Structures are given as structure tokens and as C-alpha cells.
Amino acid sequence: MVDLTTRVRLKAEWEKQLAIFMAFPHQNSDWTKHIHKARACFLDIIEHIVCFESVILCIDTQDDEGFEIVKKHFSKALDSTNADFMKTQDDEYIKNLFNQSVPYTLIQNPKSKYLANFGGNSAFSLHIVRVPTNDTWARDFGAISVELESPQNLAQNPSQNMAQNKAGQRDKQIQLLDFTFNGWGLKYPAFYDNAITRALFRPELTRQMDMVLEGGSIDSNGAGVLLTNTQCLLEFNRNPHLSQVEIESKLKKYFGLDSVLWLTQGYLVGDDTDSHIDTLARFISKDTIAYVKCEDEKDEHFQALRLMESELQVLKQANGEPYKLVALPFTRAIFDENGERLPASYANFLFVNGALLVPTYDDKNDEKALKILAQALPSHRVVGIDCRSLILWHGSLHCVTMQMYRL
């Protein structure tokens, strides 16, 4: 239980991370029809991420085929447990997050064809854990990390806190908040995914929450401001007993927020999450929001996204200033084999340590989106990843990943 005087902070995604949490596609999920494409895409995403930080990968307990595919793909000829490659401090830290009963495999310095592109000599580790899973959308069922600052170590002068930390007297810790995941408002089976945090992590590291919430439905600037929308958070099958005022009160309490910014407009056809904010508008700094903009008046999204843009333009920071806005281009209309439009979005990017990974769709606007984000984030490497396989099941890069932190 958290003391009422404990300070809570929901970090921004660009802050220093420990690892990216993911879940591998398996045959007994919605991916069955496209399993080979999906697995190839996941392997490619992991190869990119391990150039910048470690990956924690859940593989279903029944998916021995997937487990062997991952091991074969990432293990080098020299066994990763060889004494020539020592365990890092982060490897031990990550392993100790898990319940001892969870089957665990460590692949150190996993193979990545991208490593040379980013000037690295060795890749970060791949931590494989075996737990039952329904699906792969880790953003929505993964634990949400918050920073706690305990009262017994709070100093009146912030510089004193820094001194305490340097002296090894930690006054902060990370807690994993385990919200209920009910398959995006009872649309899909979610029993195993809802249980993953409890099954995987040591109980003293987690806190069970009393509301339904998906990670893709919120976005934090790390400075007490949360961006979300009414379409998702007020959808009846999530928290029907809670009003908007009550939901906002809980969000402020659980994440240590000063304000919640609510959008009421914007959607993507094919998004079955009820308009997750991570496909529409995202913080890229504490005072800057990147958002998708449709300029084709004939496109069905044009009016709703123009109204969303108008809402963003009138949002105010605590100092009364408007937020800086970065418009991202819209992809051409992309359809599946049944002629259904898919929710491709450049806003579904992923921050990793020192880089921004951006989904691409073999579209004429891919390079434009990468260039815009590179100009907006000059201190980050901006890297595109082909995510056409992911949107076949209505999600993209940010949807299949969840960041974890370490102080």
C-alpha cells in the first residue's frame, strides 16, 4: 500500500528506460492467419530495440515453436552463457523482477543486423519468460510503471535529494501498476493477458488497481500532465460505474497528475480500441505534442482530425502558454484482404534510449514523417521500422511494446 504522503510520478516515455516489454505472437491467437509475417515483424522490431536497450519477451507456455524460433534467431554460434560474456548489472536486476517459478532464458548480446548502423559493439540482452498469453498487445495489458518518492527520505531542498541519491540513500522506487485489462471493453478474450503482471512479477513490486485502463489510452509528459480522450476512457464496457470526473480523479491520484487533457475528437477507421490516444496525438517533450493530420478533404478522417487539431490548438500549459504542435502526415488508405481499412499511423512511435522508432507502411509519406520527427527531436536517432504486418490486426509499433524503468 502506498502512503498518502508518497509522491507519485508517471514518467515520460523519453526518460531513461530499463527495457521494453513485449509478447510474441503464437498460433492460438488472432495472428494464426498471418503468423509467419507477424513473427518476422516482431523479430525485426526486437533486433532494432536491442541496439539501444534490453527486451523482456513473453512467449506463451504452449508455444514451444515460437520459443525455438526466437532462440535460433538471436543466439550466436558462441553460446550466450559463455564466460567470455559476463552478465551485466541490468541483467541481474531484470531477472530479479520475476517470480522464481517463471521459466526464464537469458540471451546476451543477441544477434542484430542493425547493430553496426548505430555504432554499437554488442547488443543489449534479450530476457525470455514463459507465461500464458492471449495476444501480443503489450502496451495495453502490460504494467504501467510509476516513480514513487517515499516521505521518510524527502528533503525540503531538491539539491539535498540529489545528494542523498548520490550517497546511495535512495528515496525513490519504481512500482508496477496492474490495471484491469478486459479486452478493450469486452471485445476480445483477455483472461491470460489480464493475469500477466501478477503471474510474471514479484508481488511486492506490483500494485493491483481498481479500474480498467489500457496503456495505449493515455500519454504522459512526465511533468504532471496526461493526454487522453473521451471516446476510449468513457466507453461503457470499461468503467461503467465511473463518471468522467471520477475517472479523472483516479488518474490524478494514481499517476500524481496536476491535469488531464481530454480530447473529444479524432479516430482512425479500423482501430478497435475506441480511439487510443497513441494512434492520434503524443507528447514528444513536456511542451510539445505530435499528432496526425489529414489534408485530403475527400478522406473520411478529414473532418474529425481537423476538429481534433482545433482542440489541441486551444490546450494550455500550466504557465498559460499553448503547446507546441508537430503535425504528422497521414498515410494513404491501406486495406486488408477483405477490403477493410487499416489504422496506419505515424503517431504510434516508440521511444527507446537515445532513439525514436517509427512505424512505416511502404507509403510515400514514410520519409516525410521520419524527417519531421527527426527535426523535432534532434537529440534522438529516428529510425523507421516496417509495420505493415502489425496493422493487419489493427495495431502498430507502440501497441506491441511497453517501456519499463529503473532508477
Residues covered by each model-derived region:
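Ser/Thr/Pro/Gly-rich low-complexity, intrinsically disordered segments
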Residues: F85, K113-Y114, M162
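Long, intrinsically disordered low-complexity tandem-repeat segments
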Residues: N157-A163
